[in-house]
């Protein structure tokens, strides 16, 4: 799923820089607004 790929990118960038990517956060917010589950509600995080 596209959401999973975005989450993976955020995790990789967070590990590299200690910071989450603002662009990915915006894209993720847009997906959540379209009805995708928010990734922070997923139990496997």
Curated annotation (Swiss-Prot):
Function: Enhances virion budding, by targeting human CD4 and Tetherin/BST2 to proteasome degradation. Degradation of CD4 prevents any unwanted premature interactions between viral Env and its receptor human CD4 in the endoplasmic reticulum. Degradation of antiretroviral protein Tetherin/BST2 is important for virion budding, as BST2 tethers new viral particles to the host cell membrane. Mechanistically, Vpu bridges either CD4 or BST2 to BTRC, a substrate recognition subunit of the Skp1/Cullin/F-box protein E3 ubiquitin ligase, induces their ubiquitination and subsequent proteasomal degradation.
Subcellular location: Host membrane
SUPFAM superfamilies, per database record: HIV-1 VPU cytoplasmic domain
Gene this chain is encoded by: vpu
Keywords: AIDS, Apoptosis, Host membrane, Host-virus interaction, Ion channel, Ion transport, Membrane, Phosphoprotein, Transmembrane, Transport
Comment block on domains: The N-terminus and transmembrane domains are required for self-oligomerization and proper virion budding, whereas the cytoplasmic domain is required for CD4 degradation. The cytoplasmic domain is composed of 2 amphipathic alpha helix that form a U-shape.
Residue ranges with Basic and acidic residues bias: 1-16
Note: HIV-1 lineages are divided in three main groups, M (for Major), O (for Outlier), and N (for New, or Non-M, Non-O). The vast majority of strains found worldwide belong to the group M. Group O seems to be endemic to and largely confined to Cameroon and neighboring countries in West Central Africa, where these viruses represent a small minority of HIV-1 strains. The group N is represented by a limited number of isolates from Cameroonian persons. The group M is further subdivided in 9 clades or subtypes (A to D, F to H, J and K).
Modified residues (Phosphoserine): 17, 21
Pfam families xrefs: Vpu
Main subcellular location of this protein, as a coarse class: host cell
InterPro entries noted in UniProt: Vpu (IPR008187), Vpu_cyt_dom_sf (IPR009032)
Regulation (activators, inhibitors): Ion channel activity is inhibited by hexamethylene amiloride in vitro.
Stated name of the protein: Protein Vpu
Species: Human immunodeficiency virus type 1 group M subtype B (isolate NY5)
GO cellular component terms, semicolon-separated: host cell membrane; membrane
Keyword Phosphoprotein: yes
